Amino acid sequence: MAFPIINIADLEVGPPDPARAPTGANADNYDIRRVDIAHRIGARKLGYNLTVVAPGKHNCPFHSHRAEEEMFFILEGDGELRYGDTRHPLRAGDVIACPAGGPETAHQIINTGNTEMRYLSLSTMAPIEICEYPDSGKFGVYEDLPDDADGRRVRFRHLARHEDARDYWEGE
């Protein structure tokens, strides 16, 4: 059983996971470094991690969740929150709520400061999720599956655009 307490100061954030490395023309805009906290302390229904973002970068594309709710707590650094059609300055101590919804709740945290930005990310971890990406017109369908034999997370993942839609009866 995992010990239910961990101190953020004791967490080491390593280099980005190569499996999650961004690709494409805008790959240099992203810095994806995070340390899982939830599994280390035995959480089952909430996900949390420590996220670190370099100056001028963001951690993920502008997106919304149809099932999950997220909350972020800014620990260090300055940045900006894109939220729906608005932008808001961020600084240490800010708490951000991102409820489930459509494009009106799409969000992205951008480090606009000169030092690393560190924040705690929390999520309700819905087992089945649909995310929408307004900037690219994509959506993703995700489902958590049982871990593999080595204990690694396995996930169904499919990304598409709405114009890729097929008729329900096509090919049946």
What are these regions (language model features)?
Residues 100-129:
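Ligand-binding loop in jelly-roll beta-barrel domains
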Residues 85-101:
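Short acidic-glycine-tyrosine-enriched beta hairpin
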Residues 1-45, 132-172:
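A short, N-terminal "cap"/entry segment at the start of jelly-roll beta-barrel domains
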